[in-house]
Amino acid sequence: MSKREKIYSSVISEFIKDKNSSILVIGAQLADKVAFYSAGFTNVLLSGYDERKLAYEPYEWVKENGMSLSFDEKTFDYVVTHNVLHHMSSPHKGLTEMYRVAKKGVLVFESRDSFIMQVAERFELTQKYEVAGCYETSGVDGTNVPNFIFRWTEREIEKTINTFSPAFKHRFVYRYWSIYPDGPDLSSFKKIILNFIRPFYFLFTKLFSKQQNGFAFFIEKPTDNSTLNPWLYFDNNKLRLEVDNNWVRNNYKKNRNKR
């Protein structure tokens, strides 16, 4: 297994303890099959844009658009994707779709929009568009058009989920690592620069771990009303969420405006 596959397998085992959990993988490749199989998971459904016939056994594969999944809410215990959201024309929509069909949690592996990555982009030491590694069906939305590499921050992830599901308090967990770029599309001079700064990069990221270029984020999905935000409660008579006006009066000088 490559370093990336070992990280993948290790992280999914950390966050998904039950090997029999129902899991949907978005944008699945053979690396996904290897990671889950190596970690001992049994109930995994792989999905993707295209209809390539690959050796996915013992798992099943279905064709799905990650930004518009055909499944009902809370169909799977967990939904996972590995370096796929940045291939979508709307990565945020892909993330909220994962959240929608998950019951317990969402696990995503992506590139982090760290300060170092922003500097690397500025000096063209890394790609902004995934041109060098693009082949048929690997571009934006499963086409051969190279995608923009959308890199994430923790704040953006949390804003996206809290906007999509504002009633609940969410738990976000992050894990960081580095896959040092080899610059396949760079000139010889820039490759020399990359090799020169390599030890300084690893020293810097050892001190400041969030500056690494790769991370995984786990979003634990609320499973009951105990995780509601304090200004809300579930009305058992109306069978819906309501605003707790007593909480509002106690925490704000004036009642919120009635509409």
Locate predicted features.
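Conserved alpha-helix/loop element of class I SAM-dependent methyltransferases that forms part
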Residues: 2-20
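Class I SAM-dependent methyltransferase SAM/SAH-binding core
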Residues: 24-68
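A C-terminal cap/extension of S-adenosyl-L-methionine-dependent methyltransferases
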Residues: 61, 170-259
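Short conserved loop adjoining the S-adenosyl-L-methionine
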Residues: 68-73, 89
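A conserved beta-strand element that flanks and buttresses the S-adenosyl-L-methionine
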Residues: 80
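A short glycine-rich, Lys/Arg-flanked "PGG" loop and its adjoining helix->strand segment in the class I
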Residues: 92-108
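Conserved class I S-adenosyl-L-methionine
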Residues: 104-136
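Short alpha-helix
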Residues: 145-174
